[in-house]
Amino acid sequence: MTSAPLSDTAASAPPASAPPSATAPTSAPSSSAPSSSAPPIPRSSWLALVVILVAEMLDGLDALITSIGGPALLADLHGGPALLQWTAAAYTLSMASGLLIGGRLGDMFGKRRLFLIGMVGFTLGSLLSACAPVAGVLILGRVLQGLLGALMLPQGMGMIRSLFPGEHAAKAFGLFGPMMMVAGIGGPILAGVLMDIDPFGLSWRSLFAVNVIPCVLAVIAGIRLLPREDSARSLSLDWTGAALSATAMAAIVYPLVEGRELGWPAWTLAMLAGGIALLGVFLLQQRRRSRAGRDALIEPSLFRNRTFLAGLAIMLVFFGGTGAIGMLTALFLQMGLGMSPLLTSIVTIAEALGMMLGMAAAAKLGGTRRTMAIGMVIAALGQLLTLLGIAAQGTTVNAWLLTPMMLIAGLGIGIGMGPTFSIIITGVTDAEAGSASGALTSVQQISTALGVSTLGSLFFAIAAGTASPVLGFAHGLEAALAINVVLILLSIGLLRFLPQRAAEDAEEF
């Protein structure tokens, strides 16, 4: 499930593609009920909120359902394993790149306008993906979905603040968590039903086509209901920084996805090194731009803040593993064990249900480093039990064994990541908060793309090198799970660099 991205004026919200961050918007007003003296909110504002929530849910659904249709997609487009990796990575990587500038564009040209443009573009991307005759067109459609989704999503948070002033905002922001949970649980089931019933004979294409009608209705309703702004703001935009960051990440992800099938020629390694070098150039460019008094995509002072750096590392490591395991598990169940898409979706929602329960538990336990550690230990245990179960039973492993283990893993993920955003964001200054929020949400998407690329390549390499395809997929998932357990343990080690709880002063090196 993806997290709702953040503009400079928006608060942090739970991600939508990959594991959720399980947090409510950190800068939303108090959750207390509106006072009786507060003016009532008009019905049109609540209807506008529905439009915004539909956009958020569609993003969450789109990030989740494609893994269920993976085997059918490969058979239809005659693609190799890299196609599945690109189907996921193209979306998350393009969204991560777009999120760095999406919020600022809304401030410059108007949130309502950019929301509607983004929704129309997301619809066209869904339609292009559904109609794709070849793999390249499908990837282009996914890139379009990611970029335009990144343009659309940050605007919703800002518009809610104008639709629900004062104490009313808490109630509106409070609906985000439950709606994302619905997307997390309902997305895989919807995908499984569509694939099993296949009412229009579209097979995997129905997973993208299902977006079109809700998107069109949301655009029509949005034109009538979303608030009009008096004027846009005159701001500068760092196009150079945006291009550098996007190019760097593409240069890193491309060889990770394609390198195995190409035999790792020298140019793939050179591209990987070049992408890492470009990230360094991007950071230097951001520092120079900030020193010149111009707006930067990421405030350079954040990289002297221990809380922010530790949080960035934790999100990169934690989401890199957990974001990929969901997709690989779905592929193992279908391509390895021969489960139907519907049964696969039922098994995989156990993790989403666990996350939902974990979020609720995290709220009770409090936003502390200790809560994060407890959750991560449970997540590692769940992943380890899954690994041991598959290793012990091999091709005879069944849904009854995997479901409780995935529930445990999801519970740990929900508890562990619940306090993350609040601890990190309250560890930076007010001037850095907007930049930090956008950077963290982008990193969550980037880490998922990197995880899908690296663990996906390992998964398919092991599967291809094993005589029995069924055992090959089992061994591939075992290896990915083992690495993810190590990554979770590394995340636990990084917790020592975070404050004990939210709202402690930021600490700089």
Enumerate the predicted regions with their spans.
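Helix-loop-helix hairpins in multi-pass membrane proteins, especially solute transporters
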Residues: 113-240
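Cytosolic juxtamembrane N-terminal segment immediately preceding the first transmembrane helix
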Residues: 1-61, 75
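Central cavity-lining transmembrane alpha-helices of secondary-active solute carriers
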Residues: 89-103, 149-157, 161, 349-361
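Extracellular/periplasmic helix-loop-helix junction of adjacent transmembrane segments
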Residues: 69-98, 137, 342, 346
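Membrane-interface helix termini in secondary transporters
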Residues: 72, 103-104, 108, 193, ...
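Hydrophobic transmembrane-helix bundles of small-molecule transporters
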Residues: 197-313, 321, 339-340, 347
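12-transmembrane solute porter fold
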Residues: 45-54, 58-61, 66-68, 278, ...
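Helix-breaking motifs and short loop linkers at transmembrane-helix boundaries and internal kinks
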Residues: 76-78, 110, 131-137, 338, ...
